[in-house]
Amino acid sequence: MSYALFDINQPLDFTAHPEAGYDLIVAVNVLHDASHVVQTLRRLKLLLKAGGRLLIVEATERNSVFQLASVGFIEGLSGYRDFRRRDEKPMLTRSAWQEVLVQAGFANELAWPAQESSPLRQHLLVARSPGVNRPDKKAVSRYLQQRFGTG
């Protein structure tokens, strides 16, 4: 397992983050800070292997006073330069997250809770990068032989 920090608003650095180098990317309460959500999601998709997953946890209540009071002062909620400028609301609803994931080329796999409005005021979403990640049969065979010997 390997992990690394990633600045969502900077161009990709393939020396630090290999293209198609990750099976899973976890983004918890960070993607709403993207200056352009769809572009950021497209960059993340480039980092995922075929069939890789993007796991997102995000606040999904667009008018949450608590969210604006607690997070707004810390992170700032005005750096966006995409469709959110129209209504000056940085947070996305569950369905809006699912829409931007599709726009970025992902397939939606899971949204929990399933209902749009959640008493948690946030959702967990899982999206899949296109394609199928096929294992290298020779590498698997070598590993099994090294691990368990020949039988």
Regions found by a protein language model. Name each.
Residues M1-G151:
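4′-phosphopantetheine-dependent carrier domains
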